[in-house]
Amino acid sequence: MIEAIDFRNAMSLLASAVNVVTTAGMSGRYGFTASAVCGVSDSPATLLVCMNRAASSHIHFIENKILSVNVLAEHQQHLSTAFSSKISPEERFKQAIWTERETGSPILTDALVSFDCEIEQIQEVGTHSIFICRIVAIQQSQQEQGLVY
């Protein structure tokens, strides 16, 4: 059996885009930093997002059934740090300017690209929930380089 630490160390060697995944609802705005995001289908346009079930904001994503994947530009390392830290959700969102599209989920105004999504399916696998998300709107910026982990 592969040890969890060995798996995490090996996965850290894979280059991937850095994303801030956000949601909003009656209980407020929440978000987390994620690299486990990928395209599933172009028809219908669908993304896959993985989230640790132990995350304090996990329940809000489940209840809201919406999210936005905000792909960070190379100058937005501070947002990656903020959304992976222990600071409050309110403080996290003060670090940048946000807007909304179709779902009402927070969209980072100067992200490389943002995908506004409705969560259509949730699969539980090990420590994580896998959200299968239908994209309902896309916002692209003029940024040229993405932040890579």
What are these regions (language model features)?
Residues M1-Y149:
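Basic, polyanion-binding surface patches
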